[in-house]
Amino acid sequence: HAGLFSDAEDLLRFGEWALAGALGQPVVSGLQPPKEFASWTIRQDHPAGSSRALGWDTPSGISSAGTIMSSRSFGHTGYTGTSIWIDPEREVVIILLTNRVNPTRDTPKFGLIRAVVADAVMRALFPGAPPRPH
């Protein structure tokens, strides 16, 4: 089992929904994010030092979020190399759809590719944006 599958268009809709939830804003149509959504994106520090929020990851050091997304960002990765990262501070959703298991599952440096892509997107959208403080 490799998780959930979708396409870029639907994942963008989901990302926009999550962004609205993190900002406490309503969406134009459809299911509204719960009022508690923003609290689900805050790092829980459990166990101590963990970067995990409730169902989400948050940026820490070298992560799949790259180095430019804000510390308020939250995201999730998938086994096949996919990722979604949402930055409420800059109102950005980044989706990466890949298949890291083709032709082989032996791709130990694949996590770095996610970070490179996230940084490339952020640099394109926000030229000169500084790295996130650690």
Regions from the PLM with identified roles:
Residues H1-H134:
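Catalytic loop of the DD-peptidase/beta-lactamase superfamily, centered on the K-T-G motif
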